[in-house]
């Protein structure tokens, strides 16, 4: 089977790939200068599932056995920062939604927790909440910019998502967003960590409530940072990927 409605490539794809590759390659060097490089994204609709019947543990000659029926106790969305230089998971936010206000609150909490950081770099995808009016206003405030931002949907920097993304990507600001090419969120290193979380915890976990789900995710993050964290070895250089 093959897809046939192939989307148009991002015209800025090569530029964005080069920018993110350079960001990853220089993350540790810039960390020594007081800059932070964070790979940030949402993990949405994480289900708190409780199995109706207990697992049968593995023993010699038998794999762990699990029944397929479960009870669903709600969902959570997580916003996670993966520190590219250290390989550690930092700021994490959770809740029932993942809207513009949630993302802004997450970025604000991240920046507030690092007052000595001289410049913040966030690698994000092209979700509309990552290019919002409130985010533009916050970055302008944090960068001490006293300028006319225009009117959302009508004029100036706030006129369109594209104009807002250009502003948010300005390397002279204290907070800089680096956008992955369209349909290339795999370039965001936090996606690798999401896979680790899914394999190590979520797929085998039993959660009787969203509170227990959150507690176990936070406990796993503490365990990961203590025993497993190290920078990912990023070798992709922008060459075409062949299936």
Predicted feature residues:
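RNase H-like polynucleotidyl transferase catalytic core
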Residues: 65-70, 143-189, 206-207
């Amino acid at each position: 089977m093959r897809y046939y409605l192939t989307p148009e490539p991002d015209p800025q794809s090569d530029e964005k790939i080069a920018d993110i590759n350079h960001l990853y390659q220089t993350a540790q060097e810039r960390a020594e200068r007081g800059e932070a490089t964070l790979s940030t994204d949402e993990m949405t609709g994480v289900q708190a599932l409780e199995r109706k019947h207990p697992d049968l543990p593995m023993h010699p000659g038998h794999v762990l056995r699990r029944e397929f029926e479960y009870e669903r106790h709600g969902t959570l969305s997580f916003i996670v920062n993966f520190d590219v230089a250290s390989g550690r998971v930092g700021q994490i936010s959770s809740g029932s939604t993942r809207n513009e206000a949630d993302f802004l609150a997450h970025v604000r909490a991240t920046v507030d927790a690092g007052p000595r950081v001289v410049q913040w770099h966030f690698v994000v995808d092209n979700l509309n909440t990552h290019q919002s009016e409130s985010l533009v206003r916050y970055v302008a405030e944090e960068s001490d910019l006293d300028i006319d931002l225009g009117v959302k949907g009508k004029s100036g920097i706030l006129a369109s998502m594209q104009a807002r993304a250009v502003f948010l990507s300005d390397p002279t600001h204290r907070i800089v967003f680096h956008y992955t090419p369209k349909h290339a969120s795999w370039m965001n290193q936090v996606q690798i960590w999401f896979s680790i979380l899914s394999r190590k915890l979520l797929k085998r976990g039993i959660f009787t409530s969203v509170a227990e789900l959150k507690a176990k995710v936070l406990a796993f993050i503490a365990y990961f940072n203590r025993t497993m964290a190290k920078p990912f070895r990023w070798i992709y250089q922008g060459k075409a990927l062949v299936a």
